[in-house]
A protein has these predicted regions:
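Hydrophobic, well-ordered secondary-structure elements that form the walls
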Residues: 90, 126, 147, 184, ...
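Internal gly/pro-rich beta-alpha loop/helix module
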Residues: 1-40
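C-terminal and late-domain segments of enzyme folds
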Residues: 17, 42-44, 56-74, 79, ...
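Short, surface-exposed amphipathic charged segments that create phosphate/polyanion-binding patches used
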Residues: 1-12, 88-93, 164-166
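Cysteine-nucleophile active-site neighborhood
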Residues: 97-172
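Phosphate-binding active sites in nucleotide-utilizing proteins
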Residues: 46-118
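Short acidic (Asp/Glu) and glycine-rich catalytic loops that position anionic groups and cofactors
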Residues: 92-96, 129, 217
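Short, glycine-/Ser/Thr-/acidic-enriched flexible segments
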Residues: 54-56, 81, 96-98, 131, ...
Length: 246
């Protein structure tokens, strides 16, 4: 068989040109150990609830690790299936709320968020989180009532509205400073004329007129997905700490 002949030639070539004993000895050596994560042994004194289910599932692990390094315990919960746990702040990441919009409209979590926001709990949302925290979300000409933290209405579009890297200066009640990240969405958000926007964008589209990060009380939400290396984690965790210690 021609294939057997080719394999025999290959075997002879390797035997003549490769130090097989050395290769085999190296194969027995253990691989270098993975570096240990440099999270200091710091006891958590504040708890942040992170929405995690099929509606909210886009998170950077580094962001969650940064919260822990800043002294926060992470408690996951599902706006689709459960209630809000006992927490000092909340984080709603990106995902696909439009695929679960009817369930979210009826969710216990949705109906409780406005009161928690008015009470001063720090609540942060990104993209899908922004859409969820607005007054309503229009999809295929049907309007769904949502959390109503912000005087803004979101409309799903068939056309891509934004895709690319972002950079902005944030001046919000719960964090300040430069924030970098990216945006990717098929929706537009129409804000009321008296809406307050915290991010002045140097790069990226944002919500409207070069601004992103709508805020009300201690709640902030943006189209930007913040990069963990630039997000003011300590500010946000300290805001949760102040809320807990009132």
């Amino acid at each position: 068989d021609e294939r057997d002949y080719d394999l025999e030639k290959l075997g002879n070539f390797i035997e003549e040109n490769v130090d097989l004993d050395t290769v085999l000895s190296l194969a027995k050596e253990p691989l270098p150990a993975a570096p240990e994560e440099c999270i200091p042994d710091k006891e958590a004194d504040v708890t942040i609830g992170v929405a995690m289910d099929s509606a909210f599932c886009f998170y950077y692990q580094d962001m969650l690790d940064s919260f822990r390094r800043a002294g926060a315990e992470i408690k996951f919960f599902s706006p689709l299936e459960g209630d809000i746990p006992d927490v000092d702040g909340m984080y709603f990441g990106g995902g696909y709320p439009e695929l679960h919009i009817a369930e979210l409209e009826k969710s216990r979590t949705t109906h409780k968020l406005k009161d928690l926001s008015a009470d001063g709990m720090p609540i942060y949302g990104e993209c899908g989180g922004l859409q969820y925290l607005c007054t309503s979300y229009e999809i295929e000409e049907r309007v769904y009532k949502l959390a109503d933290l912000f005087p803004a209405e979101t409309v799903m579009t068939k056309k891509l509205q934004a895709l690319g890297y972002t950079k902005g200066q944030a001046d919000s009640p719960i964090f300040r400073g430069e924030v970098r990240g990216h945006e990717f969405h098929y929706s537009v958000t129409d804000c009321a004329s008296d809406s307050r926007l915290a991010y002045t964008m140097e790069r990226g589209k944002g919500i409207v007129d070069g601004m992103d990060g709508i805020y009300e009380h201690n709640s902030v939400a943006s189209y930007m997905h913040a990069h963990p290396g630039s997000f003011p984690v300590d500010d946000f965790v300290n805001s949760c700490r102040k809320y807990k210690q009132r």
